[in-house]
Every structure is written in C-alpha cells, then in structure tokens.
Curated annotation (Swiss-Prot):
Coiled-coil residue spans: 168-301, 327-367
Positions with biased composition (Basic and acidic residues): 236-248, 387-398, 451-464, 605-622
Keywords: Autophagy, Cell projection, Cilium biogenesis/degradation, Coiled coil, Cytoplasm, Cytoplasmic vesicle, Cytoskeleton, Endoplasmic reticulum, Endosome, Exocytosis, Lysosome, Mitochondrion, Nucleus, Phosphoprotein, Protein transport, Synapse, Transport
Spans annotated as Disordered: 1-62, 212-264, 372-411, 451-529, 562-628
Biased composition annotated in UniProt, kind: Acidic residues: 214-235, 479-494, 504-527
Region (Sufficient for self-association and interaction with HD): 276-444
Described function: Originally identified as neuronal protein that specifically associates with HTT/huntingtin and the binding is enhanced by an expanded polyglutamine repeat within HTT possibly affecting HAP1 interaction properties. Both HTT and HAP1 are involved in intracellular trafficking and HAP1 is proposed to link HTT to motor proteins and/or transport cargos. Seems to play a role in vesicular transport within neurons and axons such as from early endosomes to late endocytic compartments and to promote neurite outgrowth.
Keyword Secreted: no
GO terms, biological process: anterograde axonal transport; autophagy; cell projection organization; cerebellum development; exocytosis; hypothalamus cell differentiation; negative regulation of amyloid-beta formation; neurogenesis
GO cellular component: autophagosome; axon cytoplasm; centriole; centrosome; cytoplasmic vesicle; cytosol; dendritic spine; early endosome
Protein name: Huntingtin-associated protein 1
Residue ranges of domain HAP1 N-terminal in the record: 79-403
Length: 628
C-alpha cells in the first residue's frame, strides 16, 4: 500500500487524532552532515525581490510538498525523495532514522501486523522531518495583499475587456474578410469558367488552323501528285505509243484509274474533306466579308452618331443661351409686372378716393338740389304770405277811414250811449287788441325758420333711409384724366367754408341793415303800443277797466302798425327773385347763419315780456282778460 493511504489511516484510526502534533506535525530541523557543494541548492530567482515574494515562494513549496506527498503515482514520490523540495537531495536521508525505509518500507507503512497508531504517527513525523527539514512558515493575509489582489483582478478584468474588444474587432474583420473571400471565390470561379471557355475557343481555333494548314499542305501535295501523275501519264503515253509501234493495233490498253486507285486508296475521302473544307472556307470568307461590311457600317453609324451628338450639344448650348436670355426677359417682365401691379393698386386707391369724393359731391349736389327746391317752395310760400299783408292793409285802410271820422260823434255816441248799456264791449275790444298785437308783434321769420329746420330734419331722415350707391357703379369714364395733384378734402372743405363764411358775412350785414331800418320804423310804434299795453294793464290793475281808454288813439296806433308792416313786406318784394333771401342763403351755405345780436332796448324787453305773458298757455290759464 502507498504512504498516502497509511497517512490517512493513521490520522483516522489512531488515538492521537485530536493531538495537534499528529494532524499538523511541527517539523524540527534535522541535524545532519553538511550537504556536498555539488548538492547545494541554487538560489531561486524570486528570493531577491522581497519578503512578500519569498513568502509566496515558500507557500508554493509547502503546497508542492503536500501535493507530492499525497500524490497517487510513485514517480513524484521517488523524485521528491531523491531530489528534495528545492531540487537537491534531502539532508536527513543519510542518517539512521530513515536508513531502513528503503529496505523494508512495508514494516513502516503498517503492513506488518502489530504496528500501532503512535508508531505510525512517529514514522510520519520522522518522514516529514527527513523530507522537509525547513517547512515554510505560515503567513497571514493582510489588507495590502487584498488590495494587491483586487488591483491584479481589476487589471485582469481590463485585460479581458481589451481582449474581448480585440476579439470583437477581429471577428468583424474576419467577417469582412470572409465576405471578401467569398466574393473573390465567386470571381475566381467566373474567371475559371471564362478561362475554360477561352481555352475551348483557342483549341477550336487551333484545330481550324491545323485543318487549314493541313488542307494547304494537302493541296500542295495534290498539286505535286497531279504533276507527277501528269508526268507519269505522259511517260506512259509515250510508252504506249512505243508499245503500239511494237505491238499490233488490236492489243488491249491497260486502265490508268485502276493503277491510281491502287496507289492512293484514301484519295476520294481526302478529296471529299477538301471540298467540304473549301465550302466551309468560302462560307467563312463570306461571313468575314459580311462582318467587315457590318463593322464598316457600324463605324459609319458611330461617326454619324458622334456628328449628331456634336450637333445636339451645339443645339443644347444655343438653347441654353436662349433660355438664359428668356429667363432674363422673364425676370424683367416680372419686375415690370410688379411695378404695374403697384401702379394699379395706387390707381385703384385713387379711383376709390375719387369715387368717395364723387359720392360726397353727389350727396352735396343732391342736398343743394333739395335746398334749392326748398328755397323755391319757401319763395312761393313767401309770395303767398306776402298777399296777406295786402288784405291787412285794406283792413287797415278801412280802420283808418273809421278813425278819420269826427271824434265828436264818438264822444257823442259815448255820451249818448252809456257804457253800462254795453257790458261786454270793453272786454271784446281788449281781446281783439291783444290778439292783433300778438299777430303783428310776432316776427314771421320765426315761423320760416321753424319750417326750414323741419324741412332739413325730414331731408336728413330721407338721406339716412336711402341706401348708399354701390362702389362698383362708381367707375370713372373712359375720357377721365386724373389730376396730377389732388387737393385734400380738408383744404377743399376749408376753401368752401371760407367762401360760405364770406358770403354769409355779407348776407348778415345786409340782413342787419334791413333789420335796423325796420326796427327804426317800428320802434316808435312799438313804444306807443307798449305804452298803451302798460296803460291797459295799469287800468286793469286799478280796477277802472278799459272803458276809460281813448278808442281813437288805439285805432290810430293800430293803423300805423299795419302800415309799417305793409312797407316792410313791400321792401322784401322789391328784392329780385333770382337773388336768394337771407334764409335761403343760409340754407345753401350749409347751415343757419348766426343772426346779428340786436341791441337790447327797453321796448324790446317789454315786447318779449308781452309775448311770454300772452302765450297760448298763459291765455288758457288767465282766460278772458275782461273777467278781472
């Protein structure tokens, strides 16, 4: 049995299995003779590097010793015994301890009966001391060793990553090379096929050339043979002639074809081949001539195509130049079109402005026409209204005639007929006087102004109700020429306003002069009438009544007022019909002119007060004035 089995059985069967010396025996250095100089171990190359490397080498040698001891084969065992752990022979092999091991190893291993466990353990200890006199010391692993190992592992990982990358790149390169190799193989196969095809063609051509050369040689040989045959026939003919001279005439002649057939048995086959080859040669020559003609035609066609291509290129160059010129013209036309479009837009804007102006002018013309028609209506109304003062004038004349009667009769009538007999006479007379004064004192121009304002409001409503004309119908005529410089609407309106203002100022001045003349004529009469009104009001307030008034004086004042009013109406009629009245002028000017402020006098104030007091509402409230 091997020492390995003995060690295992000793470790398991012996009583000292728990002894540390038995499991891990401490080997003491064996004292023995000094080794020979030849047997000294050579220094290991790793001993000079440091203590760490020394310890590593020792652990490696210890593990090597264990592996050699526990090994299964006998070869490492014998090598270990005779060479030692470091190469030379062990130091304890010459002593008496291990002297009998090599003679009877079975007695020490445990094959002999009666060997106990302690003896086996002692044997193992002695064997270990003899074989490993200097066992390597055990070393503890430190953090530095761990860091070094981790650093080495990281380096290994990096190396592996780089190797993997290199392998991937190599795989890619290999795939690319494989593809290229496949392509090259396909190209090689196609090249080989082409080579075979070319070889076949070359062989065929060689055969044809050989046949052609053979046919030429055969022709030469046949010519030579024909010449020789002709010479021989001539010779034979001469011989026959000689023989005929020698022989009788009836002797048969020998057949020459039999002799030639006997001499050349393959002549017919060769002649047939020669004919076939000649026919093929003629056919090939015809094909060659035909191919030459075709090549010439192709050359001519190529030349024609080249000429046509050159002509087409020239035409393309010319067309490109024409195209460039047309593009330039097109760009120019585009610019002109844009300019014309801008001008068209400007003209359209001008047309729109002109249309708006024409619309405004049409509206103004319509308004002027309406104003003119209204002025004509007002003129006719004024004429109708002027006929009324004539009637009033006639009434005034009748009143004057009545007033021209002698006063004595009146007084006599007054004295003869007492006032108490006519109780309602003073009241009716006072009422008639008040109504007549109201009619004559009130200015008729007030009613004209009210009528004109009403007409204007109606005209404005009609203009608002009428729809504006469409913008499409407002087209300028064909012969319409736009002015070079248009006058703005603001300036045009300002000019019109200045003109109307000047006309209105002149009209106002004329109207003011007429009104002053009329008031100069009317003022004394108004003063008298107001005086009479004051007297009447005073008498009514005192309770005396209007019976104490002088009727002659009242009627005379009334006739004077009617005469003044008729004169005023005659002055208005004297104005020519074509010249518009101040009211019409104000209407045509686009508005009502401001009237000149009258100078406020005491008489005018009294007239205004009388108008206010004698208004219809006051009349309704007061009732008949004679009721007081």
């Amino acid at each position: 049995m091997r020492p390995k089995e003995q060690v295992q059985s000793g470790a398991g069967d012996g009583t000292g299995s728990g002894d540390p010396a038995a499991g891990t025996p401490t080997t003491q250095p064996a004292v023995g003779p000094a080794p020979e100089p030849s047997a000294e171990p050579k220094p290991a190359p790793a001993q000079g590097t440091g203590s760490g490397q020394k310890s590593g080498s020792r652990t490696k040698t210890g593990s090597f010793c264990r592996s050699m001891i526990i090994g299964d084969s006998d070869a490492p065992w014998t090598r270990y015994v005779f060479q030692g752990p470091y190469g030379p022979r062990a130091t304890g092999l010459g002593t008496g301890k291990a002297e009998g091991i090599w003679k009877t190893p079975a007695a020490y291993i445990g094959r002999r009966p009666g060997v106990s466990g302690p003896e086996r353990a002692a044997f193992i200890r002695e064997l270990q001391e003899a074989l490993c006199p200097n066992p390597p010391p055990t070393k503890k692993i430190t953090e530095d060793d761990v860091k070094v190992m981790l650093y080495l592992l990281e380096e290994k990982e990096r190396d592996l990553n780089t190797a993997a990358r290199i392998g991937q790149s190599l795989v890619k390169q290999n795939s690319v090379l494989m593809e290229e190799n496949n392509k090259l193989e396909t190209m090689l196969g196609s090249a080989r096929e082409e080579i075979l095809h070319l070889r076949k063609q070359v062989n065929l051509r060689d055969d044809l050339l050989q046949l052609y050369s053979d046919s030429d040689d055969d022709d030469d040989e046949e010519d030579e043979e024909d010449e020789e045959e002709g010479e021989e026939e001539e010779r034979e003919g001469q011989r026959d002639q000689d023989q005929q001279h020698d022989h009788p005439y009836g002797a048969p002649k020998p057949h020459p074809k039999a002799e030639t057939a006997h001499r050349c048995p393959q002549l017919e086959t060769l002649q047939q081949k020669l004919r076939l080859l000649e026919e093929e040669n003629d056919h090939l020559r015809e094909e060659a001539s035909h191919l030459d003609n075709l090549e010439d035609e192709e050359q001519m066609l190529i030349l024609e195509c080249v000429e046509q291509f050159s002509e087409a290129s020239q035409q393309m160059a010319e067309l490109s130049e024409v195209l460039v010129l047309r593009l330039e013209g097109y760009e120019r036309q585009q610019k002109e079109i844009t300019q014309l479009q801008a001008e068209i837009t400007k003209l359209q804007q001008r047309c729109q402005s002109y249309g708006a102006q024409t619309e405004k002018l049409q509206q103004m013309l319509a308004s002027e026409k309406g104003i003119h028609s209204e002025s004509l209506r007002a003129g006719s109304y004024m004429q109708d209204y002027g006929s009324r003062p004539r009637d009033r004038q006639e009434d005034g004349k009748s009143h004057r005639q009545r007033s021209s009667m002698p006063a004595g009769s009146v007084t006599h009538y007054g004295y003869s007929v007492p006032l108490d007999a006519l109780p309602s006479f003073p009241e009716t007379l006072a009422e008639e006087l008040r109504t007549s004064l109201r009619k004559f004192i009130t200015d008729p121009a007030y009613f004209m102004e009210r009528r004109d304002t009403h007409c204007r409001e109606g005209r404005k409503k009609e203009q608002r109700a009428m729809p504006p004309p469409p913008a499409q119908d407002l087209k300028p005529p064909e012969d319409f020429e736009a002015p070079e410089e248009l006058v703005p609407e603001e300036e045009l309106g300002a000019i019109e306003e200045v003109g109307t203002a000047e006309d209105g100022q002149a009209e106002e001045n004329e109207q003011a002069s007429e009104e002053t003349e009329a008031w100069e004529e009317v003022e004394p009469e108004v003063d008298e009438t107001t005086r009479m009104n004051v007297v009447v009001s005073a008498l009514e307030a005192s309770g005396l009544g209007p019976s104490h008034l002088d009727m002659k004086y009242v009627l005379q004042q009334l006739s004077n007022w009617q005469d003044a009013h008729s004169k005023r109406q005659q002055k208005q009629k004297v104005v020519p019909k074509d010249s518009p009245t101040p009211q019409q002028q104000t209407n045509m000017g686009g508005g009502i002119l401001e009237q000149q402020p009258r100078v406020p006098t005491q008489d005018s104030q009294r007239l205004e007060e009388d108008r206010a007091t004698h208004s219809p509402s006051a009349r309704e409230e007061e009732g008949p004035s004679g009721a007081t």
